[in-house]
């Protein structure tokens, strides 16, 4: 039995890099893992760890809601949320266009706040949980 045996863990940005490593580590510790990513390669990661994959554009509020609701149903519970997904602004402050900057804010700031609220509601059903925010852009 691992440290997170039977616990439901949601990981955003789980297709590669830090997110993939986080999802793999939780799975090794017995967690039930659901990961989301814009990239379809996340499906391979989920299959390799026995988890669930959701292709999600975190800029879209409805997709965030769908992810948490469907992941909670698939796992049976939510105990941990890891807000790992992030995007970088294309270019410098002198060249970035306002719509691009708004997307960065939506994905990097609004989405983690919204996902945290959604996941916290699920965590209350099981007596609590943990939310981890990762601040890294690859």
For the regions a language model picked out, list residue spans one by one:
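Conserved NAD(P)H cofactor-binding loop of Rossmann-fold oxidoreductase domains
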Residues: 84-89
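Substrate-binding pocket helix/loop in short-chain dehydrogenase/reductase
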Residues: 92-93, 100-105
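The beta1-alpha1 cofactor-binding region of Rossmann-like NAD(H)/NADP(H)-dependent oxidoreductases
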Residues: 56-67, 98
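Canonical Rossmann dinucleotide-binding motif of NAD(H)/NADP(H)-dependent dehydrogenases/reductases
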Residues: 2-34
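A short, exposed helix-loop element centered on a Lys and neighboring polar residues
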Residues: 116-117
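A conserved hydrophobic alpha-helix of the Rossmann-fold in NAD(P)-dependent oxidoreductases
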Residues: 42-43, 63-71
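Residue(s) in the substrate-gating loop at a strand-loop-helix junction
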Residues: 136
């Amino acid at each position: 039995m691992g440290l997170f045996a039977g616990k439901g863990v949601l990981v955003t940005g789980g297709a590669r890099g830090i997110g993939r490593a986080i999802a793999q580590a939780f799975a090794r510790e017995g967690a039930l893992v659901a990961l989301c990513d814009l990239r379809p390669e996340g499906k391979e990661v989920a299959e390799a760890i026995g988890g669930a994959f959701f292709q999600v554009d975190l800029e879209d509020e409805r997709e965030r809601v769908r992810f948490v609701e469907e992941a909670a149903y698939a796992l049976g519970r939510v105990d941990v949320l890891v807000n790992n997904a992030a995007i970088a602004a294309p270019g410098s402050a002198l060249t970035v266009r306002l719509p691009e900057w708004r997307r960065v804010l939506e994905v990097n700031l609004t989405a983690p706040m919204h996902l945290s609220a959604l996941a916290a509601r699920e965590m209350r059903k099981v007596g609590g949980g943990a939310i981890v925010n990762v601040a890294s852009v690859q």
